[in-house]
Amino acid sequence: MMKVLVVVALLVTLISYSSSEGIDDLEADELLSLMANEQTRKECIPKHHECTSNKHGCCRGSFFKYRCQCTTVVTQDGEQTERCFCGTPPHHKAAELVVGFGKKIFG
């Protein structure tokens, strides 16, 4: 039963990864958009860096693109501001854990 769960989780992860790759391929149909995409990859926001002003500019991790995660911060004056950072969502962390575990088991 445990092997079946690991295989199913691995398949779901691989399908998610391949679909995210397919979306990236669709965005780069023309040469100009491909060149612009390469330029944005060089200028993307790394993990754990602030993305408040550019919420779609996070870099790509080993399997998935990082997501801009926001939180509301209350200053000492009582003023609320939104602060965002690039990070890995929990379900992506779980998928990466399953893939890493699968690599250790199956080599």
UniProtKB/Swiss-Prot annotation:
Residues 21-41 form a propeptide. It is found in: Secreted. Disulfide bonds join 44-59, 51-68, 58-86, 70-84. One of its GO terms (cellular component) is extracellular region. GO terms for molecular function: toxin activity. Keywords: Disulfide bond, Knottin, Secreted, Signal, Toxin. Residues 1-20 form the signal peptide. Its main location: secreted. It comes from the Eukaryota. Expressed by the venom gland. Coiled coil: none annotated. Belongs to the neurotoxin 19 (CSTX) family. 03 subfamily. The presence of a 'disulfide through disulfide knot' structurally defines this protein as a knottin. This is U1-lycotoxin-Ls1y. It comes from Lycosa singoriensis.
